[in-house]
Regions:
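Short, solvent-exposed loop/turn elements at domain surfaces
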Residues: 14-17, 52, 80-81, 181
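Short, well-structured alpha-helical segments in soluble
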Residues: 55-69
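Second-shell loop/turn segments in exported
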Residues: 11-18, 44-45, 142-149
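Loop/turn elements at helix/coil->beta-strand transitions in domains of secreted/extracellular proteins
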Residues: 2-4, 38-41, 65-70, 164-171
Length: 222
């Protein structure tokens, strides 16, 4: 019998920038090589630009196909992305409203209506380049971060629960972060304390920049 493995996640799980070299393809080749007498199907259900709100829906639909193993690698798009907080937005959109929109868009009638009533310029359909991410970065002290983390935990719990009740094994991977070569996208505004005045930030920052040009770095900060 064929063993079916589902991969859930976002662009990193999909294999961006080239899905042909994503870890799901590599995993499938490794399994075929290690167990030549066993048939495997590694099905990548990841998508670029989504987050746990969508992963929850995908998981519920995927569970119907009774996979033998599920691999989840997600968490990159919670603070910047669809339904994420924006710097100039006050409260987060109510969770019930998000759920209602998703339910509506799961129907053909809802999709037809959405195409006609949504704004002509949908910002989240634009290219998400570095300028986009710099525009949407949030302060480390933004209180909405806690709500985002709470929603992420809730969404993932519901997504995993549908497989747990079916006794399907689930592997959940931590999101990798390249802290050495990928500095913060931005710094607090002038109305807030600068990073170098924050003792929780300053020490690890300078330690990470050891060997660099400290004077040049100071000139770049607000």
């Amino acid at each position: 019998d064929t063993l079916r493995i589902f991969v859930l996640g976002e662009s990193a799980a999909m294999g961006t920038p080239e899905p042909a070299f994503g870890f799901s393809r590599i995993l499938e080749r490794l399994l075929h090589h290690r167990y030549p007498d066993q048939a495997f199907e590694v099905i990548n259900l990841a998508m670029r630009g989504i987050n746990s709100h969508m992963i929850r829906r995908i998981a519920m639909e995927a569970a119907v196909y009774e996979p033998d193993l599920v691999i989840v690698y997600a968490g990159n798009n919670e603070l910047v992305g669809w339904q994420a907080p924006e710097p100039d937005q006050a409260p987060l959109r109510p969770l019930k409203m998000i759920r209602a929109q998703q339910a509506l868009l799961s129907t053909r009638l809802g999709q037809w209506l959405w195409q006609r009533i949504r704004p002509f310029k949908d910002e989240w359909n634009q290219e998400q380049d570095m300028a986009f991410f710099r525009k949407h970065h949030l302060s480390a002290k933004d209180p909405r971060r806690e709500e985002v983390l709470s929603r992420f935990a809730g969404n993932m719990s519901e997504a995993l629960e549908v497989f747990v009740v079916q006794r399907v094994p689930v592997l959940v991977g931590s999101v990798l972060v390249n802290e050495r070569d990928f500095p913060p996208l931005g710094f607090p505004s002038s109305s807030e304390a600068t990073p170098l005045n924050d003792p929780l930030f300053a020490l690890p920052w300078w330690q990470a920049c050891e060997g660099g040009d400290r004077e040049w770095l100071e000139e770049q900060l607000p």
